[in-house]
Swiss-Prot record:
It is found in: Nucleus. It comes from the Eukaryota. Its main location: nucleus. Component of the RIX1 complex, composed of IPI1, RIX1/IPI2 and IPI3 in a 1:2:2 stoichiometry. The complex interacts (via RIX1) with MDN1 (via its hexameric AAA ATPase ring) and the pre-60S ribosome particles. Component of the RIX1 complex required for processing of ITS2 sequences from 35S pre-rRNA. This is Pre-rRNA-processing protein IPI3. PANTHER family: WD REPEAT-CONTAINING PROTEIN 18, WD-REPEAT PROTEIN 18. GO terms for molecular function: chromatin binding. GO terms for biological process: DNA-templated DNA replication; pre-replicative complex assembly involved in nuclear cell cycle DNA replication; regulation of DNA-templated DNA replication initiation; ribosomal large subunit assembly; rRNA processing. Belongs to the WD repeat IPI3/WDR18 family. Keywords: Nucleus, Repeat, Ribosome biogenesis, rRNA processing, WD repeat. The lineage of its organism: Eukaryota, Fungi, Dikarya, Ascomycota, Saccharomycotina.
Length: 518
């Protein structure tokens, strides 16, 4: 098991792995705005800088293609992309919800396409007053969260965006005073209704945590964390144990279950429901001993610093053991979460002296490393099938919703079913069992002279028969038992043959009755 890392800058796009050395550079890839690249299956969609164009690449680990596959023209330049995926695992949770491609412009306009057909479903002209910085679908695609440079965070219903002419937001949060740069949603949530935690970071140097619930009229603000620097990114541990916050001068690790002593015997939950707490973050300094309990009484928290450079984006590995920090110099640093030490650096392969700028997008996903085996031909066939799939051209005019609308999306394929043997029907299975029984019945009795005594207890080993008379008696008893079992097996085989003959006779009579009735 490995993790694939895809990161882009203003002049490059790189596909690599965390635990291996393979690397590929995507050609003609230029994404200068954050969150302007998304994955749609094995296809990578990148909104090009200063162009009304989306480049499509294949990032399948089996194909390893670097060339551009498709170009999708757009009505205007897009600065942010997101997708709403199909989730068919849970019955009753939007099983027919198609892939939706969301795109936003620097002016705050929101586009919603149906990726299966390319139809433009909705254009929200003033979704935000300024550029949208990030979009994400949550709760199995039921809701879409958008954050903008206008310091607002809006939660939309996906059905409202698709069906209504003028969709209205479900919630609007405007507690920040400057642009919201990033947000993260808790991994511990129910897949059927809105019940989760939302973390937002802003240039006003604060992190705010909200409790999202369908039973509340408005999201409840649980805690506010103030930092000494403007914040650029945020990531959440898979188990919701720690927040990783990025700034222009480094990244901080904020544990949500705060230790008041070095032994960890006393823990405090920083996100207590019903209380709005305000905490100030104090950077931890090496070699300086402080009283964490005294700082906590004053509303201050001690946080460790992971890296001392400009951090534009943060991603956490699948198991939470590593953190990927995208830097302002165009590379990614892999940091161990326990020791807070860098273990690897991922950099694009460019000519010396090339100015890459900060990393604008970073995407991680788990992948299975398969060695050469009997399934190699199957993997090659799947890779060719993936390459053959093309994303349809995106429409520039809004689709007319008055008539019927056929929903088109790619159905999932089960690769294991193609290699598993075909299930046997009952008559064939019974014939196979009868044949095996006849083989065992006609096999002569074989006596082995090997005695296994190593697995017996010492007391049982001493109780073994010593005289030859007792050994002969034991062998006779064994022969009698084998003869009895053989006789029982023959009786069962005969009964099975009689039952099968009766079944065939009744089946023939049934067929005759059907023919006469016609």
């Amino acid at each position: 098991m490995d993790e694939q890392v895809i990161f882009t800058t203003a002049v490059s796009g790189t596909v690599c792995q965390v635990h291996s050395v393979g690397q590929a550079n995507l050609r003609q890839c230029a994404a200068s705005t954050p969150n302007s690249a998304v994955l749609m299956g094995d296809k990578l969609l990148v909104a090009q800088a200063n162009k009304a164009l989306i480049n499509v690449y294949s990032v399948d680990s089996r194909s390893k293609k670097e060339a551009l596959e498709q170009r999708l023209p757009l009505p205007e330049q897009l600065s942010c992309l997101a997708v709403v995926e199909n989730h068919t695992g849970d019955a009753g949770v939007h099983q027919q919800l198609p892939y939706l491609l969301l795109g936003s412009t620097p002016s705050g306009k929101l586009y919603v396409w149906e990726a299966g057909s390319g139809k433009l479903l909705t254009v929200k002209a003033m979704a935000h007053y300024q550029a949208i910085t990030k979009m994400q679908a949550i709760i199995n695609g039921k809701y879409v969260v958008t954050a903008g440079a206008d310091s607002r965070l809006i939660i939309w219903q996906t059905a409202s965006l698709v069906l209504e002419e003028e969709p209205k937001p479900l919630y609007v949060l405007h507690d920040h005073t400057l642009a919201i740069t990033d947000f993260a949603v808790s991994n511990a949530h129910n897949g059927k209704y809105l019940n989760s935690k939302l973390y937002t970071v802003s240039e006003d140097m604060t992190v705010r945590c909200y409790q999202l619930s369908s039973q509340l009229e408005q999201p409840q603000l649980l805690a506010t964390f103030t930092f000494p620097l403007a914040l650029t990114s945020i990531a959440l541990d898979p188990a919701d144990r720690c927040l990783y916050v990025g700034t222009r001068e480094g990244a901080f690790a904020l544990p949500l279950f705060y230790k008041l002593d070095s032994s960890g015997a006393t823990l405090v939950n920083l996100l207590q429901p019903g209380k709005h707490q305000i905490y100030s973050i104090v950077p931890e300094q090496a070699g300086v001993e402080v009283n964490k309990q005294e700082l906590y009484r004053m509303g201050q928290l001690l946080c460790s610093k992971m890296l001392s450079c400009h951090v534009s984006l943060i991603r956490v590995s699948m198991d939470g053991s590593m953190v990927l920090l995208a830097t302002g110099s165009g590379n990614c640093v892999v940091v161990d979460t326990y020791s807070k030490q860098p273990v690897k650096e991922l950099a694009p392969l460019l000519a010396p002296g090339t100015q890459t700028g900060p990393v604008s997008n970073i995407i991680t996903r788990s992948m299975t490393v398969k060695s050469d085996s009997l399934l190699q031909d199957l993997n090659l066939a799947d890779a060719r099938a993936t390459e053959a799939i093309k994303i349809p051209a995106l429409a520039k005019t809004v689709f007319d919703k008055t008539g019927t609308h056929d929903i088109i999306y790619c159905a999932p394929t089960d690769t294991l079913s193609s290699v598993l043997p075909r299930a046997l029907d009952l008559p064939q299975y019974l014939d196979m069992i009868a044949e095996e029984d006849s083989v065992f019945a006609n096999t002569p009795v074989t006596r082995s002279t090997v005695k296994v005594v190593g697995e017996l207890a010492p007391a049982k080993a001493e109780a073994l028969p010593a005289s030859s008379a007792e050994a002969q008696q034991s062998a006779d008893d064994t022969d009698a038992e084998v003869a009895r079992l053989r006789e029982s097996l023959q009786q069962l085989t005969g009964a099975y043959k009689d039952l099968r003959a009766l079944h065939e006779k009744l089946y023939e009579e049934h067929e005759k009755l059907l023919q006469t009735s016609k």
